Amino acid sequence: MEHIFIINPSAGQGKAVKLIPKIRKALEGTTYAYSIYTTKAAGDAERFVRETCEAGKEVRFYICGGDGSLHEAVNGAKGFPQAEFGLMPVGTGNDFMRNFGKKQDFMDILSQVEGDSVPCDVIDINGRYVVNMANIGFDCEVAAQVGKWKQKPFIRGPVAYLIGVAAEFAKPMGRRMSFRWTDGTTMAGRFLLCTLANGCFCGGGFCSSPKAALNDGLMDVGIVKMIPRKKFIGILPKYKTGTYLDTKLAAERVLYEKYRKLELAVAEPANISIDGEISQFTYLKAEMVPSAFRFIIPKGLEDGAE
């Protein structure tokens, strides 16, 4: 088996590139066959993984980047559910790995190579695999702000997220959305935000979907009705810790359920954040794909997926 480390040179303001000498130092002189591939542009990781899988090679991929890099790579392995992916989280948010442990748990190279893998679901949204989460509305607009602020020196993920929240509070909030469930029932109205979650975390550690599991075959759908700004500010600390669902405000204003499929439409093109990357949509169909890929748990780390 070959162990392929995929380096995203733009991830984490260049932190991924700094891993190259550490990878070589850890694996040279061992019996592990390995190689290092540095991506050349957006979408290159997806192409590289797809071509490698189609060639029938027995490999493991280790993504040196963030959630966006993992998103690309897993999309390259569509149709290859036995493809194995490790993650060395040097991106901005690094939310996917939070479902299993802390960042330092994933930074030891030998522990990654010697780790076992577990099956993980994905959400298929209009033909694209979502590894962690899709956000629409307030959360998505904050993510767009984070994308701007994270380019600034000394501003890290959680700080950038809080700045993004403050910036969005100054704008008109809410968007009209129309939902259709698998039983044919519909719901329409003006909502603050909607999350379609495979994992629990977004925004660099905000536990927006505390009941989510990566292997239950279900997406956690959170729909937040319009909330006055003052009340929303008050609930933010509990939104970060994942305890907001226990509040009276959530009982009145939050719809939180698990689904296998749903459809969502908006009247005008709207932003959607998919694994932290921003695009636009007017209609989407979301459907769970169970056990779509395998995720490597570093040796010695308790398996958080089970």
Describe each model-derived feature in a short phrase:
Residues M173-R175, R190-L192, N215-D220, R260-L262:
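A generic structural signal for short beta-strands and their flanking turns/coil linkers
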Residues G79-L192:
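Catalytic core of DAGKc-family lipid kinases
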Residues S69-F80:
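Short Gly/Thr/Asp-enriched flexible loops that form oxyanion-binding sites at enzyme active sites
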Residues D139, T195-S209, I278:
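Glycine-rich phosphate/pyrophosphate-binding beta-alpha loops
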Residues K150-A160, G204, P210-K231:
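Gly/Ser/Thr-rich active-site loops/lids in small-molecule metabolic enzymes
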Residues M1-F61, M107, E302, E306:
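ATP/NTP phosphate-donor binding region
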Residues W181-D183, A188, A213, I223-E306:
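ATP/nucleoside-binding phosphotransfer catalytic cores, i.e., glycine-rich phosphate-binding loops
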Residues P9, C64-G66, V90:
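Glycine-rich beta-strand-to-loop/alpha-helix junction loops that act as flexible
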